[in-house]
Amino acid sequence: MEDITQLLSDVLEDLVESELKQFTRQLWIGVKPGVEPIPRGKLENKDRQDVVDSMVQQYSEDAGTITVQTLRKIKQNERAKRLESNLLKVQSQGQENKQNSEEPQPIPQIISQPIQQIISQPINNAGSEDLQPIQADWQRPRQIIPCSQETKNTLLKAHGDDIYTPRSGTQRKGLALLITNIQFANTQHNRNGADRDEENAEWLLRSLGFAVIKYRNLSGKDIRRAVENFSKRREHEDADSTFIVIMSHGTRIDNKDAIVGVSDDVYFIEETFSHLNSVNCPALIDKPKVILIQACRGGQSSGVLAQDSVFASDSWVHMEKDFVCFMSTMPNTFAYRNPIEGSFFISYIVDVFCSSAHRDDIMELFRKVTLRMEKDQRFQGQAKLLPCIERTSISKRFYLFPGL
């Protein structure tokens, strides 16, 4: 925050007195709807540092963005552009420092040999290795099969305009949002094993080339704020696609799927579509938006594994373009989670993506996950566990092209 404060001070120092008056006046009359004005008494006849202090006190981490918007309001476009660039550099450096201060994680390596060579043999013979069920002692592969340039060229040639084509660069670019609730206000609702899901999901997203924004233990209100803030990230403008992964307890209220926050308030999943639709997130127009939900959806079951449900409690009304939502279970059904190893849904996704993302599009990957879970004998009868695709509006083939 100190770096941002210094940047704001430097910008205001460059303003002449008349420009500073325009700037402070804009702050007290209001920069834009939804941004609370700063009281006039805190700004009038104050020096530049006082103005900066008032902005930081009022807007906290948003002070930099609001300064950029205010500069544009008073036609200081070059200064706004320069400040925006400097803010991104500070933010990037902050994320890098945070990562460096954390315990280093093994860097995933991309290999060419089949994924089946590096994981344990399946518990039974079900035919194709691609269709084997996840065994109880499954461990996440540390590798992902890359897509060769030849395979990519073949797919592009075969399907042409029917593919979401990566924009540029050596790797598909995009942001991913990862929210995992583990510890709840009511400790009886704690989701043991969910930390493994978080670790596995983050590893997969980073291996696929996505920058991951991660949150843990959020209330329903905080989930709403996190998704809304994510939808406003400027990085989406240069992105090819995005992933949103939310893992918590879940329920259904008035035929609507809801995520349960750590304070037992809820976040309705349909809000994610609203925040990321063409109106509220124009930067993601015509780009795939993949939503993965590990949570219960109401219902009852006699299964013996941990269940991602808290409340004892159809379909959405409107559609948006280029969305697909893959949920861990059918409506009115529990989702299961191993208290040590994490959820079967996330484990299957990681396993299938590692072995098949180099050649299959996203819908085929989801089909393989569903088929493998359907064949898993642990989830037959009353303890049924079958994921489903909801509210899809994907209009083209979405290939992840790992490694390219």
Swiss-Prot record:
Recorded name of the encoding gene: caspb
UniProt-listed GO biological process terms: defense response to bacterium; innate immune response; pattern recognition receptor signaling pathway; positive regulation of apoptotic process; positive regulation of inflammatory response; positive regulation of interleukin-1 beta production; positive regulation of neuron apoptotic process; positive regulation of protein processing
Function comment: Thiol protease which cleaves IL-1 beta (il1b), releasing the mature cytokine which is involved in a variety of inflammatory processes, and mediates apoptosis. Component of the NLRP1 inflammasome, which plays a crucial role in innate immunity and inflammation. In response to pathogens and other damage-associated signals, recruited to the NLRP1 inflammasome in its precursor form following the recruitment of caspase caspa. Its subsequent activation causes the cleavage of the midformed pro-il1b and results in il1b maturation and secretion in the extracellular milieu.
One Gene Ontology molecular-function label: endopeptidase activity
Subunit architecture: Upon direct LPS-binding, forms large homooligomers, resulting in its activation. These oligomers are often referred to as 'non-canonical inflammasomes'. Heterotetramer that consists of two anti-parallel arranged heterodimers, each one formed by a 20 kDa (p20) and a 10 kDa (p10) subunit. Interacts with caspa. Interacts with pycard; the interaction only occurs in the presence of nlrp1. Component of NLRP1 inflammasomes.
CC per GO annotation: canonical inflammasome complex; cytoplasm; cytosol; NLRP1 inflammasome complex
Enzyme nomenclature, EC number: 3.4.22.58
PANTHER family: CASPASE RECRUITMENT DOMAIN-CONTAINING PROTEIN 18, CASPASE-1
Domain remark in the UniProt entry: The Pyrin domain mediates LPS recognition and homooligomerization.
Organism: Danio rerio (Zebrafish)
Broadest EC class assigned to this enzyme: hydrolase
Coiled coil: none
Induction, per UniProt: Up-regulated in response to pentachlorophenol (PCP), a toxic pollutant. Up-regulated in response to bacterial lipopolysaccharides (LPS) and bacterial infection with E.piscicida. Up-regulated in response to bacterial infection with E.tarda.
Propeptide: 1-171, 301-316
Name this polypeptide is given: Caspase b
Entry comment describing in which tissues the protein is expressed: Expressed in the spleen, kidney and liver, and highly expressed in the gills and gut.
Post-translational modification: The two subunits are derived from the precursor sequence by an autocatalytic mechanism.
